[in-house]
Amino acid sequence: SAASDGYKRQQLCQAMEYDIECKYLSLSRYSLRIPEFHLMKEQCVDRICLGGIDVTFEKVMKRAGLTDAECLSIAKECGYKDSMHDILSYSTIMELKPVLRSNKHFLKMVYSHSEHAYSDTISYLRQEGLFDGLSFAIADSGWIGSIQQSLKNLIHSVNPSINFEGYYFGLYDLPDKASASNYHAFYFGPGNHILRKMRFCNCLYEAVLSAPEGMTVSYECTDN
């Protein structure tokens, strides 16, 4: 099971005594994207500049893993010093992409934080057996399948021969260039069950079925 949304599914799997080993991975989009960014180079800006609800310049910088001081520094360079907390429209966020992509100072900060987080993240995945040579799949709530893509990129940075598939409650869409054969949805998928999507509230779903602990933000090695 992947991330907090896989919490209840892992419990159900264990209760039904399926003949499969089921582990709970503590991860999130954020905890995987930060160490992934330096592998993506300038393409990481596409992950950082995503639309959403109540997106501000500060939130965009936090997605990149920047500190408060670094956020302010880039805000000054990009002309957002006095509007860091203003809500950005989707079109404004898209216009921000080329600005950040061409800002070497910003990218240097992003890569630095990413490289710092990379080693412990890989160590955690290794600790959980993802490099042991066994076949595995991930189970998650779904929505756009980006966790699977980030997890794949991190794993392939160590061993490109490791492949796995994802099983989801529902998928609205797939990541760019993702192979549909590696993504399996139960309740609705990218090209079907429009009515189910209209009636479904993923916020309620997550509120009811998520794990009791907070979101995983990073990994740290302790006591060797």
What are these regions (language model features)?
Residues 17-64:
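Long, charge-dense
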Residues 2-7:
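Short, small-residue-biased leader/transition segments that mark boundaries at the very start
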Residues 40-44, 55-62, 69-224:
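Long, contiguous domain-sized segments
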Residues 12-15:
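Domain-level signal for soluble alpha/beta catalytic cores
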